[in-house]
Structures are given as structure tokens and as C-alpha cells.
Amino acid sequence: MKQLPILEPGDKPRKAAWYTLTCPGDKPCPRVGHSCSYFPPVGEAEKGKVFIVGGANPNQSFSDVHTMDLGTHRWDTATREGLLPRYEHASFLPSCSPHSIWVFGGADQSGNRNCLQVMNPEARTWSTPEVTGCPPSPRTFHTSSAAIGNHLYVFGGGERGAQPVQDVKLHVFDANTLTWAQPETHGSPPSPRHGHAMVAAGTKLFIHGGLAGDRFFDDLHCIDIGDMSWQKLGPTGTAPVGCAAHAAVAVGHHVYVFGGMTATGALNTMYKYHTEKQHWTILQFDTSLPPGRLDHSMCVIPWPVMSASDTEDSGSVILSLQDEKGDAAEKPETRSGGSREESPTTLLLCFVFGGMNTEGEIYDDCLVTVVD
């Protein structure tokens, strides 16, 4: 397989192209089942960071945390004090505390977990807060994109081996009140499954695919948290095949799905779903495709570039990531002027780290592609 082009700091990536990021420093070792979160900048001088939390290889579960600084483009280790080893867990950054990373569930070699842990943004240590309400049973639940506002939404997950938990309730954790709840829902929920992609876009949660025993699902379900009604969707276009252990992110009205596994191997395809038009598109790339993979993790990151623009007649559009309602979104601003000049522009990239193929090869690569 051909090598992907390397994206250097300041380079302007093309659409319909995959790139590799090669940042120096203390990089995470090859792993699966980790979480991948974009951490917004704390000060004006910062550009934000990507946090890789936990994960596993065939020999062990990890309790380490690595960060990629998007300003210096270097890897470093972050605090691991207090973090329990886990893989195939969920992570989220609630709007009430956007500089705290929460993790839920997952597993280590001894079994599944259902505890919540949070990284204190100032002390940089992990703690296990006391919560109220009825938590979900211990399970694997691998997502970094199933949160809206202060709430993490949990549906399904892994019980043991290829078997999912039989629970089809929607579990909701409120990071502001430290409370679990199981709200009443309407309609028919998805059948029990694990390894599904679950992603929030606006006020809706989308669930695609997953696995139960030897059955791979290709269905797409949605629940709107406004009315708590489940809906099985019948979208048009070219939809992903039945798969599991894939990853998804949301940008505005689009959901991007990449990778996963089928009964015949690992996938390296990316699909885009338009949430308003209910239409799937398989994306075509001008570059080589990355190696097929499963059990990887993704997030959306900003990528600043310089571009020449004539500001006399029209402003230059600046894009930024918003952490509102758990979505990555585009926020236009304009800058006016009277001459042609180099102006900063921020693109949005889908950032992919790690995973493995079905032959047992585990990855530690960083992949990016433009999303909009």
C-alpha cells in the first residue's frame, strides 16, 4: 500500500485527500479501544490539544494519557494519576466544564466497568466522583461523540465476547448534577448491539451498525432528545455495509463514518451522512486510502493555514470549532480590509488515531482528512 502524504504544520490540505501527521515527542504506543478527544485552548496563545486516553493491546490495558499539542505539534504524556486502565470506553467534555475530560465504562483484563472518572483540569489528576441514580450495567461502549451539552448518552454496548448487553434503555448522565437517569422513550429502540457508532448532531443521536453474535447490522436509528422518540431511518444514497467497531464524528449537518470490520475484514472507506436530507454518500479520495482498521478513535480538530485573499470586496471566512451541544460546527466570521494579504483560515480535519486490522496488526498512526 502506498504511503500517504505527510501534512506539515501550516500546510493547506486538499479536500478528498488523506494525510499522515508525524509529530515528534512521547507518542502513544500502538493500541485499540482508546478514546480520542479535542481539548479546546485554555489561553489565547494555545491552539488546543488532542487527548488519547487508555486503550489496550493483546498484553495489557492502558491507564496512560497522551496529548498532541496543536500549537507545537508535539506529543507529550499527560497525567495518569488515578486513572483506571480501560479500553472501549466512552469519553466526553461537558459544556459545564469544557476543560474536563470524562470517561465511562469500558473494560480491562479483569472485566467490564461502569464507573465514571474525570480529569481535573487544574490538578491534572483523575478522580472517581460519587454519582446518584442507577448507572448502566458494566459494559464496553466505545465512542467520543455521544454527548450533548452536559449529558452523555449511553445505548447498548458489549457484555462478553461478541455478545451485547440485552439492555435497550437509553441511559443519560448529567455531568452538572452527577446523576444517572433512564428517561422514558417512545417508538422502537435499536435491537441489542455493541460496536455500533453513536454520534450526536444537534439535538439528535444517531446509531449506525454494530454487532450481536455473528450478525452485523447496517441499519441507522435516530432519537431526538427533544421528544425522546426513536426512529428507524430509511436514508437514500450509498450507505455503509453492515459493520462494527467503526468510528463517527459530526460536523454541522454531516456525520462522517470511517473504518470498521465486516465478516470479511477491516474497512478503509469513509461515508458522509446528511442529517437533514437523510442521504448517504461514499467519499472518493484522490490519494491512497489508509489501511483498513477497526477499534480506532476519531475527533474533529481545527487546522490553521495561511491563504492569500483580496479583502477589498469580500471578507475572508474564518472557521472555528464550537463545543456547543457536543458538535463540531463551523462558525463564520469576516475580516474586512482594502488589500490583498495573507490571512489566517482554519479548516476542520477529521483526526484518526490507532486501531487494528483483522490480521492482528495494531496501529499507532495519525491520519487526517478535511471535513466540512
UniProtKB/Swiss-Prot annotation:
It is found in: Cytoplasm; Endosome membrane. Keywords: Cytoplasm, Endosome, Kelch repeat, Membrane, Phosphoprotein, Repeat. Residues 321-342 are annotated as: Disordered. GO terms for cellular component: endosome membrane. Transmembrane segments: none annotated. Residues 322-342 have a biased composition (Basic and acidic residues). SUPFAM superfamilies: Galactose oxidase, central domain. Pfam families: Kelch_KLHDC2_KLHL20_DRC7. Kelch repeats lie at residues 49-95, 100-146, 151-203, 204-250, 254-303, 349-372. The keyword rRNA processing does not apply. Phosphorylated on Ser residues by PIKFYVE. InterPro entries: Gal_Oxase/kelch_b-propeller, Kelch-typ_b-propeller, Rab9_kelch_effector. Rab9 effector required for endosome to trans-Golgi network (TGN) transport. Interacts with PIKFYVE; the interaction recruits RABEPK to the endosomal membrane. Interacts with RAB9 in its GTP-bound conformation. This is Rab9 effector protein with kelch motifs. It comes from Rattus norvegicus. The gene is Rabepk.
